[in-house]
Amino acid sequence: MNESITRRDILRTLAFGAAAGSVLQVIPAEAAEYVHQMVHKEKAAAPAGKYAPKYFSAPQYAALLFLCDTIIPKDEKSGGAVEAGAPEFIDLLTSENPEYQLKLGGGFFWLDAACTDRYGNVFMECTPEQKKEIMDLIAFRKNAKQDASLSQGVAFFAFLRNLTTDGFYTSKIGIADLQYMGNTALHEFPGCPPLPE
């Protein structure tokens, strides 16, 4: 990686590319790997090796952890989004991008307000059933067409789901989950299979 490029340059490039589309489609793997390395360095430098959020408040970060874990949970095959560092990846990108700050900060504000209106509690203080109910409402775009008051929540969740997926599948855990071995050379090209007669 070019040493003259700063951390801020990389994060801005990543955030801009992700805003235009999926990180996996737009952002070079080297740049996404750089963000994961920065997260690792932040954790290593922190007391007890715990990542300190750069942008999100403690309640927002707790909600981010919960949502990322719900979007890609840990299973018997591999760790989930939280173990892969997706929340930290998202926080680090958001700390450098005003558009992300507006979309995600506004989304968490909307989520707490919607839960307060429906259940009398902010999202993280809701029961598991209430959390599932509100997430089911914002997980599908069709719900925003049926109820316009959900449109901001649906847009927020779609954006967060994409970032979580990008953060997961650009991490070591996500790449291992895909069983991606990299570009490998064929020792011999077997040719096309014969056509059925």
Pin down the residues of each PLM region.
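Generic hydrophobic alpha-helical segments
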Residues: 17-18, 74, 167
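Hydrophobic, helix-length membrane anchors
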Residues: 19, 23-25
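Extracytoplasmic/periplasmic/luminal assembly and interaction segments
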Residues: 71
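C-terminal segment of N-terminal export signals and the immediately downstream linker at the start
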Residues: 3-4, 25-66
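N-terminal secretory signal peptides and thylakoid transit peptides that target proteins
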Residues: 1-18
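Mature-region segments of soluble proteins
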Residues: 2-3, 48, 59-66, 77-78, ...
